[in-house]
């Protein structure tokens, strides 16, 4: 059993380090019940490193234990759960389940109620109008990018970041490009984002630096003059992930990667 766990940790570390992306430095995240190798449709997954990491962290699940659904479009419920876990490091959102923010999202009729209510409370996701959230609707590339930018610390208010109004998608895609959230995506702003590309965008967000807005006031109106980097990525803040380009040569008796 110990050898099996060590082998799993080694494969995890190899897939991360050889791709010059992220490494679980302390290996503090427990082994997931499902890995990318359990998906029978893994040949359809283009962003394998991204999916492997996110499944390992518990951020992303398959449509079932054996099907990831790489080419399926991402639903609003799924993004709410992914962003919640990426920000909190846990999948338990029960304390938010009974907030009853939207008429079509309650603990009784929507499995993602807690995730949705939390994301609404921190401005990551908003409703679609008429007191509704439309939990099972698909998301576009720009909508997903906006949620992740807000998760990184960007302010969604129209007066501050122009993430609302007629040009919101242009402004979101500009900032998403600057933060490299769109690396490897290959879809236009208003295209329904696939689950595969959503995993890649969240993977990119984990590597992006979190920011803090710097405010000024003009005639009683508050606005952001700039965003200051916090010196920590989203992945490091939540999961202790660190970037590395080192080669993994083995794994020690404690299950930690040995780097060259």
Spans of features found by a protein language model:
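Feature responds to low-complexity, polar/acidic, surface-exposed segments characteristic
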Residues: 2-48, 61-113, 122-142, 149-192, ...
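Mature N-terminal segment immediately following signal peptide/propeptide cleavage
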Residues: 51-60
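Alpha-helical segment that forms one wall of the substrate-binding/catalytic cleft
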Residues: 142, 146, 196-203
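Calponin-homology-like cytoskeleton-binding modules
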Residues: 119
């Amino acid at each position: 059993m110990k050898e099996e766990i060590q082998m799993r940790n080694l494969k995890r570390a190899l897939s991360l380090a050889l791709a010059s992306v992220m490494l679980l430095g302390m290996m503090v995240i427990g082994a997931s019940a499902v890995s990318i190798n359990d998906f029978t449709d893994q040949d359809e997954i283009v962003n394998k490193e991204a999916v492997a990491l996110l499944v390992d962290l518990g951020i992303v699940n398959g449509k079932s234990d054996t099907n990831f659904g790489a080419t399926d479009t991402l639903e609003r419920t799924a993004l709410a759960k992914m962003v919640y876990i990426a920000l909190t490091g846990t999948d338990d959102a029960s304390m938010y389940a009974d907030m009853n923010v939207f008429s079509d999202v309650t603990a009784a009729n929507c499995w993602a109620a807690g995730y949705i209510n939390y994301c609404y409370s921190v401005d990551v996701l908003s409703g679609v109008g008429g007191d509704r959230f439309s939990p099972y609707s698909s998301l576009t590339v720009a909508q997903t990018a906006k949620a992740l930018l807000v998760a990184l610390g960007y302010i969604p208010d129209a007066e501050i970041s122009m993430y609302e109004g007629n040009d919101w998608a242009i402004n979101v895609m500009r900032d998403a490009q600057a933060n490299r959230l769109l690396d490897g995506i290959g879809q236009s702003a208003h295209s329904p984002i696939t689950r595969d590309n959503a995993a890649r965008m969240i993977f990119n967000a984990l590597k992006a630096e979190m920011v803090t807005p710097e405010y000024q006031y003009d005639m009683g109106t508050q606005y952001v003059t700039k965003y200051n980097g916090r010196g920590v990525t989203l992945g490091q803040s939540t999961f202790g992930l660190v970037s590395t380009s080192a080669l993994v040569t083995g794994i020690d008796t404690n299950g930690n990667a040995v780097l060259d």
